[in-house]
């Protein structure tokens, strides 16, 4: 199950079920007749924090929301659990998750006693979050311990807003050049070329023959469907069954804000949408080329 809330910057917040488990974080048996002090060092938060941004990459699926390789951020994590006949709840904010805080302190263990530190770990899309919470337990060595039990574990994650085919307006940005696909007039046709403006909008459609790219900024009404000419220039024509208007997308549905994709033409099957420094425009469909493009959701 998941719940969704739209946020700014092309992202949406989705609540998903995640895996959480109690583990032995530290165990010490003091079989002597005097107390013993032990120094414990632990890291609270993300175990392997190796990014300057909050963007993570999923290494396994999370329901129907995250697939392997998908980018996401962790907004918060919440776990309810039972221990010693009581139910409790603990949560971590985004700041706490990403802080990766190292904590060191000393505990005193009485004689003939066993010290156990239970740590609550959560896994969100392959990212391990350590010491969400801890429980220190001191028992006689011979006593069988009661392991805390997770009741429910949920996380709020931030992912790119879903691109709904046929309705969601997007910008199409060249991944390497960081310029947007725009529409200008060439040879009395609407034509695609790269530019700095992010005001040009497109809608992706899909039919049985492939993906279609519709511009919302044509200067000739009805001439709005991207196709490859025989010479490789990309223009916008009236709607038809022409396979030159169909494209094969490199990424499976659903598409999301921030997805990086390629567009291969369905007629010129070895040719892909790409940058090329032409005489008047620079968006082409050329043989053995498949440049990467970033899809950005246009805020309503």
Swiss-Prot record:
GO function terms (MF aspect): toxin activity
Key words, A-Z: Antibiotic, Antimicrobial, Cytolysis, Disulfide bond, Hemolysis, Ion transport, Membrane, Secreted, Target cell membrane, Target membrane, Toxin, Transmembrane, Transport
GO cellular component terms listed in the entry, alphabetical order: extracellular region; membrane; other organism cell membrane
N-terminal signal peptide: none
Superkingdom per UniProt: Eukaryota
Main location: secreted
Localization, UniProt: Secreted; Target cell membrane
Sequence positions that bind an N-(acyl)-sphingosylphosphocholine: 187, 229, 235, 284
Tissue-wise expression: Expressed by coelomocytes.
Site positions per UniProt: Crucial for binding sphingomyelin and important for inducing hemolysis: 189
GO biological process: defense response to bacterium; killing of cells of another organism; monoatomic ion transport
Region (N-terminal cap domain): 12-35, 110-158
Site (Crucial for binding sphingomyelin and inducing hemolysis): 22, 247, 293
Disulfide feature: 274-285
Region described as C-terminal receptor-binding domain: 159-299
Span list, region Beta-hairpin domain: 36-109
Family: Belongs to the lysenin family.
Function: Pore-forming toxin that specifically binds sphingomyelin in the plasma membrane of various cells. Has antibacterial and hemolytic activity.
Record note on quaternary structure: Binds to sphingomyelin as a monomer by using its C-terminal domain. Forms a nonamer when sphingomyelin/LRP-3 ratio is lower than ca 500. Oligomerization, but not binding, is influenced by the fluidity of sphingomyelin.
UniProt name for this protein: Lysenin-related protein 3
Organism: Eisenia fetida
């Amino acid at each position: 199950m998941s719940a969704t809330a739209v946020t700014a910057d092309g992202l949406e917040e989705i609540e998903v079920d995640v895996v959480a488990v109690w583990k032995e974080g530290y165990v010490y048996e003091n079989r002597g007749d005097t107390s013993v002090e032990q120094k414990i060092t632990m890291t609270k938060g993300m175990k392997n924090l190796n990014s300057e941004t909050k963007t993570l990459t999923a290494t396994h699926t999370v329901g129907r929301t995250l697939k392997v390789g998908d980018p996401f951020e962790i907004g918060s994590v919440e776990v309810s659990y039972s221990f010693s006949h009581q139910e409790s709840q603990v949560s971590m904010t985004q700041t706490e998750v990403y802080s990766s805080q190292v904590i060191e302190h000393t505990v005193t263990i009485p004689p003939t006693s066993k010290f156990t530190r239970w740590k609550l770990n959560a896994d969100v899309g392959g990212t391990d979050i350590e010491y969400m919470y801890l429980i220190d337990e001191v028992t006689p060595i011979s006593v069988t311990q009661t392991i805390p039990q997770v009741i429910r574990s949920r996380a709020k994650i931030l992912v790119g807003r879903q691109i709904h085919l046929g309705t969601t307006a997007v910008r199409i940005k060249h991944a390497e050049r960081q310029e947007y696909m725009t529409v200008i007039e060439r040879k009395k046709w609407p034509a695609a070329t790269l530019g700095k403006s992010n005001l040009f909008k497109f809608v992706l459609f899909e039919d049985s023959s492939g993906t279609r790219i519709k511009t919302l900024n044509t200067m000739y009404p009805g001439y709005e469907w991207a196709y490859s000419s025989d010479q490789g220039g990309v223009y916008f024509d009236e709607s038809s069954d022409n396979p030159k208007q169909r494209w094969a997308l490199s990424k499976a549905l659903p598409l999301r804000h921030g997805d990086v994709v390629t567009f291969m033409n369905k007629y010129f099957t070895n040719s892909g949408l790409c940058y090329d420094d032409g005489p008047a425009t620079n968006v082409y469909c050329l043989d053995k080329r498949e440049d990467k493009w970033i899809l950005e959701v246009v805020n309503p």
